Amino acid sequence: MTKLTKKQRAVVRQKFGGKCAYCGCELPERWHADHVVPVVRKLKAVKTGHHTYKLVSTGEMHYPENDKLENMYPACVDCNLYKHAASVECFRKMIVDGFRGAVNRSQSLRCAQRFGMLTVTPAADADVIFWFEKYQVEKESLNDQ
């Protein structure tokens, strides 16, 4: 299933009301169909210069069994590129750790924090809840009414 048909893309796009499965933004015209459970593409090193190489996809997958429509979620470009080949739980951790690390590494953010311009609340340590999780809860509560 390397390439989705237009009909399949339309189905994936509407899985969560036309929104990114992760951040919940309205999907723009250009969006990605993400493998929730990664397929992990195989890579090979290609020589580009005297001592330089770049990694390119071979077109093969380590987990081709995950390449199915049920495993595809709609994602905005930013979320999908950041998630890359991570699992949902790993992506959740990447977001929390990335935020904490950004504050710790940035002198301007630490300064803003000292001057009260930036407040890191306990919510920053809370679990990241993705749109698809909220959407499913909302959908279930509507069905219960």
Where are these regions (language model features)?
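Histidine-centered catalytic micro-motifs used for acid/base chemistry in nuclease
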Residues: 32-38, 74
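Extended charged
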Residues: 1-7, 11, 15, 24-28, ...
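Compact nucleic-acid interaction/catalytic patches
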Residues: 39-45
